[in-house]
Amino acid sequence: MGAQGAPLSHSIAAVNPLASQSVEFVGSFPDPRVRVDPPLPEIAFIGRSNVGKSSLLNALVGRPGLARVSGSPGKTTLLNFYRLSRLYLVDLPGYGFARSSKSARAGYRKLLHGYLETRQTLAGIVWLLDIRRDLSREDREMRELLTESARPVLPVFTKADKLTRSALHTRERELAQALDLTPDQVAVTSSRTGTGIADLAESVLAAALREAS
């Protein structure tokens, strides 16, 4: 993805290394400069509203209901921090909700810019994209922003269970190509069936450990 930093590696794992760790909700914060203790590597999760971000976070840590699945997309405007033993998972607000006001969109951009620019402990970003959907204008804008941030990014295609196997491979190839990537540079997941969850958890943990070393 252009001038961004080294991509998060796409790992292969038989067992989810995050599901066995204790996890707690730290809090929701409006200030991207918030200090959390202890200072641990952070992995941020970002995607369009309704991309399945909360469901994926719950699947990653093996805790159904930890991250609340909102019935009102576009309402979350805070940074949600979850602490595991060696890292934080940070749930960033979803983007692209059609009913958001102009002021809400401006506030979102300010929050996101502030987070990407100021977090010294940010080890990487997991960017979620619905595998059934082509890139939207908002997705392309997010791609530019992530590239400019020079942070490590792993694109993750969600909702793989919604497609047949043949359609899944086709969409994986098409969407990766739209990002100027190859299929081995992205991850494909399903929170419902568990497809790709252990591999993604391994990638997340590896990125955090590299930041800590």
Question: What are these model-predicted stretches?
Answer:
Residues 43-51, 55-57, 68, 80-81, ...:
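Structured catalytic cores of enzymes that bind and process phosphorylated ligands/cofactors
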Residues 30, 75, 87, 94-96, ...:
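Conserved nucleotide-binding/hydrolysis micro-motifs of P-loop NTPases
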Residues 113-184:
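Conserved C-terminal guanine-recognition region of P-loop GTPase G domains, centered on the G4
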Residues 20-33, 162-213:
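Canonical P-loop GTPase G-domain recognition
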Residues 35-37, 71-80, 93-123, 131-145:
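Switch II of P-loop NTPase G domains
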Residues 39, 65, 78, 104-108, ...:
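Helical mechanochemical/support elements of P-loop NTPase systems and associated helical scaffolds
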Residues 5-99, 209:
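Conserved G1/Walker A P-loop phosphate-binding module
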